[in-house]
Amino acid sequence: MGVEGLLEKGFVTTSADKVINWARTGSMWPMTFGLACCAVEMMQAGAARYDLDRFGIIFRPSPRQSDVMIVAGTLCNKMAPALRKVYDQMPEPRWVISMGSCANGGGYYHYSYSVVRGCDRVVPVDVYVPGCPPTAEALIWGIMQLQKKIRTTNTIAR
C-alpha cells in the first residue's frame, strides 16, 4: 500500500518530530538586524526577484514575533548589548544567521578597538553566510541550510 492508499482513507502516519519540524521550516519569520551594507542585500532577498515568501519566510518587525534573527553587518561594542537584549526577547525556539564577513568575524574592521570580532561572541549562531557583502543567493543558501538543520533536530525529548 502506497501513500495514495493512505490518503484515500484519510490518514497519514508520521512522527511528531517530523510534523513539528516541517511546520517550523515552512514558516520561518526572521527579524532583520541590519547594521551595514549586508542589510541592503538582505532587503534585496526579500524583494520580488528572489521572493522569500515562497519559502514561507516573512520578515517581522518585532523580536517577539520572530524565530530567526539575521545579523547583517559590522557589530560594534556599543551595539552588542542591544543585540543580546533583542535576542533574549525572541520566543523559543530561536535561531541566528550571521550574514557577511563583518558579522562572522569582524571583516575589514577585525582589528578595530570598537568592533566585536563576530556576533557569535554575543549570541549563539546557527548558520554563517560568507561574503562581503554576500549576495541574495548566498542568504537564501544560508536559510536553506538552517531549514536543513531544523529538520534534523529533535523537538520532543526521549
Swiss-Prot record:
It comes from the Bacteria. The keyword Metal-binding applies. GO terms for cellular component: plasma membrane; respiratory chain complex I. Its cofactor is [4Fe-4S] cluster. GO terms for molecular function: 4 iron, 4 sulfur cluster binding; iron ion binding; NADH dehydrogenase (ubiquinone) activity; NADH:ubiquinone reductase (non-electrogenic) activity; quinone binding. [4Fe-4S] cluster binds at residues 37-38, 102, 132. Binds 1 [4Fe-4S] cluster. It catalyses: a quinone + NADH + 5 H(+)(in) = a quinol + NAD(+) + 4 H(+)(out). Its main location: membrane. GO terms for biological process: aerobic respiration; electron transport coupled proton transport. This is NADH-quinone oxidoreductase subunit B. The gene is nuoB.
